[in-house]
């Protein structure tokens, strides 16, 4: 089964059965002479889905902005949820919401700009998305192109007019899986694996399907492998030489036995972190504070855990009849 993270209604899945059958063009290379880091403070953009009678799909998505310095949470708006899984991004550059939406039979899911509650289509070459993140004057996405299979790392300019495939795989076998930003270095850290190896590992509990951790420099568009592990990665964050991983042995049931590790990227040595949380999803690291989607006891939500003081803040708790789909650290 294709490993795209979805929280989706049967109606939406039916709509998307033919979403990726259209014609596509190669993604054009991006032309950016410099990529100065946006001076705005890093922030979280959060997506939370809910049932909506106003939407054709019966669901909608809320987009939230969280100021990590002021520790203030604000809902920025709502959009229809028609894509395979809800994905929103609040941009501090134009005070607008970007979101993924179903574009029509054979046309896949595309990125739209919510412009006075109307959707302005910004892309036409994609099929699906796992991530959309603001990185200074650019956007990073983990996306699937029309007529392709795997999720790739893609960098787009501020208007989505020029995009580049920064880690092209001729075999179309490499999945870009977990993603996080490294704002102070203007970089993206992400894990990737071979889909064929992962399928084989699913057949044998604890089977070997190595994951590689790569660092993408958004200024040069160059990638570098910084770490490798035999484990399945279900969470990643990085700052400086500190890499935080949520991982587990491969296999359908053994993946539930995940643990959190801190890796020194200079020495490649790892130590297990025993945190009072259950983390098995998106993470981010900034000023030695670990932001993550997980559980504290029976309460699922987004938390901020200070790795130095061991204190934590609750950013958002899940509420009845709504589901926190994910977040991203943007700048």
Task: Give the ranges of each region predicted by the language model.
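Residue position within the beta-strands of beta-propeller blades
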Residues: 44-48, 99-100, 140-143, 189-192, ...
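Blade-level signature of beta-propeller repeat domains, shared across WD40, Kelch, NHL, RCC1
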Residues: 301-303, 308-331
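Short loop/turn segments that connect beta-strands within beta-propeller blades
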Residues: 68-71, 114-119, 157-161, 217-221, ...
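Beta-propeller fold detector
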Residues: 73-80, 121-127, 163-169, 224-228, ...
């Amino acid at each position: 089964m294709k490993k795209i993270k979805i929280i989706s209604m049967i109606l939406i899945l039916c709509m998307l059965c033919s979403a990726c059958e259209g014609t596509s063009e190669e993604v054009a290379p991006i032309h950016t002479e410099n990529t100065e880091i946006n001076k705005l403070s890093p922030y979280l953009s959060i997506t939370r889905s809910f049932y909506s009678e106003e939407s054709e799909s019966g669901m909608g998505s809320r987009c939230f902005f969280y100021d990590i310095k002021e520790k203030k949470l604000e809902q920025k708006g709502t959009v229809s949820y028609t894509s395979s899984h809800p994905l929103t991004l609040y941009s501090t550059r134009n005070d607008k919401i970007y979101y993924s939406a179903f574009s029509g039979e054979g046309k896949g899911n595309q990125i739209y700009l919510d412009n006075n509650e109307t959707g302005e289509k910004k892309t036409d070459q994609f099929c699906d998305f796992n991530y959309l993140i603001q990185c200074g004057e650019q956007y990073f996405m983990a996306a699937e192109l029309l007529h392709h299979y795997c999720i790739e790392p893609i960098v787009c300019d501020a208007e989505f007019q020029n995009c580049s495939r920064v880690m092209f795989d001729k075999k179309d076998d490499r999945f870009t899986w977990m993603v996080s930003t490294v704002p102070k270095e203007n970089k993206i850290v992400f894990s990737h694996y071979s889909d064929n190896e992962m399928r084989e590992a699913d057949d044998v509990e604890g089977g070997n399907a190595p994951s590689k951790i790569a660092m993408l420099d958004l200024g040069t568009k160059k990638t570098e492998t910084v770490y490798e592990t035999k484990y399945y990665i279900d969470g990643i964050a990085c700052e400086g030489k500190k890499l935080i991983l949520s991982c587990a042995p491969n296999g359908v049931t053994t993946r539930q036995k995940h643990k959190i590790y801190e890796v020194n990227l200079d020495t490649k040595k790892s130590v297990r972190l025993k945190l009072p949380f259950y983390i098995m999803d998106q993470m981010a690291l900034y000023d030695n504070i670990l932001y993550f989607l997980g559980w504290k006891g029976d309460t699922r939500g987004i938390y901020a855990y200070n790795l130095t003081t061991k204190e934590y803040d609750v950013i958002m708790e899940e509420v009845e009849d709504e589901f926190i789909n994910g977040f991203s650290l943007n700048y």
